[in-house]
Amino acid sequence: MTAPLKAIDGSADLPALMNDLASRARAAARVLALAPAAQKNRALEAMERLIRARVDTIIAANAEDVVEAKAAGITSSFLDRLTLTPARVAAMADGIAAVREVADPIGIVTESWQRPNGMTIERVRVPLGVIGVIFESRPNVAADAGVLCLKSGNAVILRGGSDSFRSCRAIHECLVEGLREAGLPDAAITLVPTRDRAAVGLLLSGLNGGVDVIVPRGGKNLVARVEAEARVPVFAHLEGVNHVYVDGAADLEMAKSIVLNAKMRRTGVCGAAETLLIDRASQDKIKPLVDTLINAGCEVRGDDAVRAADARVKPASNEDWDTEYLDAVIAAKVVDGVEGAIAHIQAHGSHHTDAIVTADVAAADKFLNEVDSAIVLHNASTQFADGGEFGFGAEIGIATGKFHARGPVGVEQLTSFKYRIHGTGQTRP
């Protein structure tokens, strides 16, 4: 088994260690803010190459994490998020390549105007600074967050879950070597070298001004803790209670395909559908939709109308409408048209991702305009709630708040702006 780093079991020096990491990251952020796009892209090219070359090393490290997690009795959905395969490592490398192709936003003048006194004002994109990313079981987050922050000129401090510690360390080694090949500082992408949970609290404190933004990736308990305790801004979503509404004007075959994909493509991702809403005007669609789900191995929990259509449907409780299962389970309910669907989502949704399936353009427009979620879709699966699918290369998370970033947080969303003003000696009267 890979030898643990010194702080893995806790250390009286942990506050000093974390403050030192933040200090080094801040220094690296100053370098990255001025690094040309070509230099950052050289680092990304090297990272992609190293990830591909070391797939066996990464999977071996991950296998140790998986063995330990199984012994701890983790759930099947958690195990799916933790496990790396050759295909998933290849996808990680593909994501790095995609980020490399994204235009560098830093230094871009997004708007420019001249005032009556002759001054020219420019609004220019700049990095946020140092970003702290706290995540749980998904080791691929280490790569996604690392390269997105690099491309956007930010330094990042990664604090992965103890379950994925070895996997993240193997991935991080590739990222750091890529930085070195491009002549960029190691501290541009820092992995907290400990499983000590106290490190999370220290990171949330902002480390004496060393961290500018926190991004949590994990379950609702982690996200709730981050939002409650963080002393710096947070980009986060609490959970993904996502809905697919099948309207009376929906094509049945399209609806079956979308519902099946939205729920069962990957049940453990935040874009998975958790509730199926069916228009009362199309109750003939209930049975085939339920058949499609149950035949794919999904448990369906429904209201009386859904249960009347299929005896295999289990009764839904009030809690089911508010549950993010992250498993092969879905709640199903009959509603009174698009108005009923919107009302249900307003009462039980999490402002993440919701979809309507319909051929009625007016119903689709009403749904898209009135559902207050970061991502709303017409005739498409909720599993497209992903930065890569948006053309962002990858994502550091899905933000469901309304300040600064909303939806998939990619390279551009990890920037802010400043104003540059050019004068010719103007003074204010």
From Swiss-Prot:
Its EC number is 1.2.1.41. It catalyses: L-glutamate 5-semialdehyde + phosphate + NADP(+) = L-glutamyl 5-phosphate + NADPH + H(+). It is found in: Cytoplasm. It holds the Pfam family Aldedh. InterPro entries: Ald_DH/histidinol_DH, Ald_DH_C, Ald_DH_N, Aldehyde_DH_dom, G-glutamylP_reductase_CS, Glu-5-SA_DH, GPR_dom. CDD domains: ALDH_F18-19_ProA-GPR (cd07079). GO terms for molecular function: glutamate-5-semialdehyde dehydrogenase activity; NADP binding. The keyword NADP applies. Gene3D superfamilies: Aldehyde Dehydrogenase, Chain A, domain 1 (3.40.605.10), Aldehyde Dehydrogenase, Chain A, domain 2 (3.40.309.10). GO terms for biological process: L-proline biosynthetic process. The keyword Lipid metabolism does not apply. One of its GO terms (cellular component) is cytoplasm. Keywords: Amino-acid biosynthesis, Cytoplasm, NADP, Oxidoreductase, Proline biosynthesis. Belongs to the gamma-glutamyl phosphate reductase family. Catalyzes the NADPH-dependent reduction of L-glutamate 5-phosphate into L-glutamate 5-semialdehyde and phosphate. The product spontaneously undergoes cyclization to form 1-pyrroline-5-carboxylate. HAMAP family: ProA. NCBIfam families: PRK00197.1, proA. This is Gamma-glutamyl phosphate reductase. It comes from Bradyrhizobium sp. (strain BTAi1 / ATCC BAA-1182). The gene is proA.
